[in-house]
A protein has these predicted regions:
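Helix-to-loop junction immediately C-terminal to a conserved catalytic motif
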Residues: 56
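A short, flexible loop at the N-terminus of ABC-type nucleotide-binding domains that lies
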Residues: 1-4, 13-27, 78-79
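Conserved ABC transporter NBD signature motif
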Residues: 64-76
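Short helical segment in ABC ATPase nucleotide-binding domains corresponding to the A-loop/adjacent helical element
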Residues: 93, 104-113, 123, 127
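ABC ATPase NBD coupling module
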Residues: 73-90, 114, 119-123
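The feature captures the beta-strand-to-loop junction immediately N-terminal to the Walker
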Residues: 41-43
Length: 130
């Protein structure tokens, strides 16, 4: 099976007024194959959410590369950045709905709607996921 998510030397730094430059993720490498199940475990503040946000495209890398389904979506050294809506991912957030005016079904269906998946297929896939 091919690698579906690849992170190469991914680093994320933030600059704050009080602490200066803080490294949230440092030289992280990851390869996830199709069908694999995985989770990020670690204490608060260790970079789990930041890593997921970089994969989804909500945070830019400070260094490194991210590839999804065989195509590069973020390569800092080449100034390559594919926005979240063009990465082919959906994300369920841990705190509240992404769109509070939508119910759970509508929130889960939204990425499929954006991709213009037929309505009957959306209903089938969302029901399977929930």
């Amino acid at each position: 099976m091919d690698d579906q998510i690849i992170l190469k030397h991914v680093t994320k730094r933030f600059t704050t007024k009080t602490l200066g430059t803080v490294t949230a993720v440092n030289d992280f490498n990851l390869s996830i194959k199709e069908g694999e199940c995985f989770s990020f475990l670690g204490p608060s503040g260790c970079g789990k959410t930041t890593t997921l946000r970089m994969i989804a495209g909500f945070e830019d890398l400070s260094e490194g590369e991210i590839h999804l389904c065989g195509r590069p979506v973020s390569i800092k050294s080449q100034n390559l950045y594919v926005p979240p809506e063009h990465r082919g991912l959906g994300m369920v957030f841990q705190a509240f709905a992404v769109w509070p005016h939508m119910n759970v079904f509508e929130n889960v269906a939204f990425p499929l709607t954006i991709k213009k998946v037929p309505k009957d297929e959306i209903v089938k896939r969302v029901n399977e996921a929930l």
